[in-house]
């Protein structure tokens, strides 16, 4: 008897499945193959039959028009609109303006800043050139191990902050560099960060594993485990999005050029005193000037978004311009060789005027000069 009931239930279930498949055959839902990244970020996506879809469209259009009427009086700033178009989840577009304000506040806190003159005040055995050689070498190490750019910028930040509080001798400077990169890589290189042995090897085994681990602990204590400070890259990621708005034909070029100029700025000890946001804005200013030398590199949107006027950038832009022309740091080759590669659009070889027009830095209200 039980077997007969089971058979009956199975027969009814089979009949339902057959009826469902026949209904789907009559109203087939078109499908297409999509890349995983293009899939909507929804866990409850279902296939809707065509007839129901038309009804939903009508309801949606009514609701949309109501929402548009409600939002008509709330016109966001142009820079917020740019953020809202971002598909990068790291940009967190619903909270973009709040995040920018928080980063600007955070970058200026003393615990996140190196001393602007730590070599003169704290270090007795180091020179600005030694620091520049270390930074240039760390750029090469980051390329060798294919580390993300955030790791490199954070490494230099850790080095400068550590040297601001702990005097060392020159023989330990390279050890500080690799130990700082080890910390930064563990923060950003989520998949397969380099091991301690890799950093020992890259120094030609000048330092042992125990020395690297010990210096890592010293750096963490000196920084009081404050490892999330904003870097030039933090702001560059956002500023370049605005800078690309009227450079539609050369978006990759301006992005790589901004990165190149930012890495050049890290070579120069003079730039330690500038906030990351100022260095980032200066890189954007100079990159736009290099690509289009006859067009004003700054405009109202950039001023509004970066919170810097062109006049605020003049000295910093001049330093990076000298670095680009090898008037400063001309013996350092790693950064320049990196950006001479085709994968970076050979931006290190782009010609630039030896002089920056002073008119571009006049503190005036810029309107529509994009």
From Swiss-Prot:
<dbReference type="InterPro" id="IPR004367">
    <property type="entry name" value="Cyclin_C-dom"/>
</dbReference>
<dbReference type="GO" id="GO:0044772">
    <property type="term" value="P:mitotic cell cycle phase transition"/>
</dbReference>
<dbReference type="InterPro" id="IPR048258">
    <property type="entry name" value="Cyclins_cyclin-box"/>
</dbReference>
<keyword id="KW-0131">Cell cycle</keyword>
<dbReference type="Pfam" id="PF02984">
    <property type="entry name" value="Cyclin_C"/>
</dbReference>
<dbReference type="Pfam" id="PF00134">
    <property type="entry name" value="Cyclin_N"/>
</dbReference>
<protein>
    <recommendedName>
        <fullName>Cyclin-A3-4</fullName>
    </recommendedName>
</protein>
<dbReference type="InterPro" id="IPR013763">
    <property type="entry name" value="Cyclin-like_dom"/>
</dbReference>
<keyword id="KW-0132">Cell division</keyword>
<dbReference type="GO" id="GO:0016538">
    <property type="term" value="F:cyclin-dependent protein serine/threonine kinase regulator activity"/>
</dbReference>
<keyword id="KW-0195">Cyclin</keyword>
<dbReference type="InterPro" id="IPR046965">
    <property type="entry name" value="Cyclin_A/B-like"/>
</dbReference>
<comment type="similarity">
    <text>Belongs to the cyclin family. Cyclin AB subfamily.</text>
</comment>
<dbReference type="InterPro" id="IPR036915">
    <property type="entry name" value="Cyclin-like_sf"/>
</dbReference>
<comment type="subunit">
    <text>Interacts with FZR2/CCS52A1, FZR1/CCS52A2 and FZR3/CCS52B.</text>
</comment>
<dbReference type="InterPro" id="IPR006671">
    <property type="entry name" value="Cyclin_N"/>
</dbReference>
<dbReference type="InterPro" id="IPR039361">
    <property type="entry name" value="Cyclin"/>
</dbReference>
<dbReference type="GO" id="GO:0005634">
    <property type="term" value="C:nucleus"/>
</dbReference>
<dbReference type="GO" id="GO:0051301">
    <property type="term" value="P:cell division"/>
</dbReference>
């Amino acid at each position: 008897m039980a077997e007969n009931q089971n058979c009956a239930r199975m027969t009814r279930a089979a009949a339902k499945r057959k009826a469902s498949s026949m209904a789907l055959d009559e109203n087939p839902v078109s499908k297409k193959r999509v890349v995983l990244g293009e899939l909507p970020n929804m866990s409850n996506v279902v296939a809707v039959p065509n007839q129901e879809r038309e009804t939903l469209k009508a309801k949606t259009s009514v609701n949309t028009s109501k929402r548009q009427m409600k939002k008509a009086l709330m016109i966001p700033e142009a820079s917020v609109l740019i953020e809202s178009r971002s598909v990068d989840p790291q940009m967190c577009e619903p909270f973009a303006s709040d995040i920018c304000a928080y980063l600007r506040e955070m970058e200026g806190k003393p615990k996140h800043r190196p001393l602007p003159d730590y070599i003169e005040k704290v270090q007795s055995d180091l020179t600005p050139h030694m620091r520049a050689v270390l930074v240039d070498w760390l750029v090469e190490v980051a390329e060798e191990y294919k580390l993300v750019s955030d790791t490199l910028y954070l490494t230099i930040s850790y080095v400068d902050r550590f040297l601001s509080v702990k005097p060392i001798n020159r023989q330990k400077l390279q050890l500080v560099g690799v130990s700082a990169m080890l910390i930064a890589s563990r923060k950003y290189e989520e998949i397969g960060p380099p091991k301690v042995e890799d950093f020992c090897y890259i120094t030609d085994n000048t330092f042992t594993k125990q020395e690297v681990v010990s210096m890592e602990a010293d750096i963490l204590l000196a920084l009081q485990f404050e490892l999330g400070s904003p870097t030039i890259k933090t702001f560059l990621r956002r500023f370049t999005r605005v800078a690309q708005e009227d450079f539609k034909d050369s978006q990759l070029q301006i992005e790589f050029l901004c990165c190149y100029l930012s890495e050049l700025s890290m070579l120069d000890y003079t730039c330690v005193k500038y906030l990351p946001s100022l260095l980032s804005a200066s890189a954007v200013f100079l990159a736009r000037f290099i690509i289009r030398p006859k067009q004003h590199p700054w405009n109202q949107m950039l001023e509004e978004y970066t919170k810097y006027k062109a006049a605020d950038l003049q000295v910093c832009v001049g330093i990076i311009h000298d670095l680009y022309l090898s008037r400063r740091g001309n013996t350092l080759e790693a950064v320049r060789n990196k950006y001479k590669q085709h994968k970076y659009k050979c931006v290190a070889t782009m010609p630039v005027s030896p002089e920056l027009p002073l008119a571009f830095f006049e503190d005036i209200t810029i309107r529509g000069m994009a």
